[in-house]
Amino acid sequence: MDVTRLLLATLLVFLCFFTAYSHLPPEEKLRDDRSLRSNSSVNLLDFPSVSIVALNKKSKQMSRKEAEKKRSSKKEASMKKVARPRTPLSAPCVATRDSCKPPAPACCDPCASCQCRFFRSACSCRVLSLNC
């Protein structure tokens, strides 16, 4: 009886190894450098060569001036985009992504609905379908 258990255990171990190794991809053995070069997916000739160019003082100053102009234009653009205060909604409703925990009024957007999480401790108005 011990012999049959030993054979069954050996068979079980063999089957485990066989199933584990059957799912692994076969390894390709490269014999030399030539096969490595031919099998490599990245070819070094595909990349463009890099050229290093020395900058003179005039080009550095021009680039600094251009950078300052860009910075000043960005500052002016940001000053133009002053945040306007939101006007309060006349109807008693909850805006999208705001808290709608009951007994709050309904959501303002007709496509939105109040969704609660964490045992109704965090509720917010969310739009469920974009086709609405």
Curated annotation (Swiss-Prot):
Domain of life of the native organism: Eukaryota
Covalent S-S links between cysteines: 93-108, 100-114, 107-125, 111-132, 116-123
Alphabetical GO biological process terms: hormone-mediated signaling pathway; melanin biosynthetic process; melanosome organization
Leader peptide range in chain numbering: 1-22
Membrane-spanning ranges: none
Region entry Disordered, spans: 58-88
GO MF annotation, one: melanocortin receptor binding
Positions annotated with a glycan in the UniProt record: 39
Biased composition (Basic and acidic residues): 63-79
GO CC term, one of those recorded: extracellular space
Keywords assigned by UniProt, alphabetized: Disulfide bond, Glycoprotein, Knottin, Secreted, Signal
Subcellular location field: Secreted
Residue ranges occupied by any Agouti domain in the UniProt entry: 93-132
SMART domains to which the protein is assigned, alphabetical: Agouti
InterPro entries: Agouti, Agouti_dom, Agouti_dom_sf
Function: Involved in the regulation of melanogenesis. The binding of ASP to MC1R precludes alpha-MSH initiated signaling and thus blocks production of cAMP, leading to a down-regulation of eumelanogenesis (brown/black pigment) and thus increasing synthesis of pheomelanin (yellow/red pigment).
Comment field on protein domains: The presence of a 'disulfide through disulfide knot' structurally defines this protein as a knottin.
Entry protein name: Agouti-signaling protein
Organism: Cercopithecus mitis
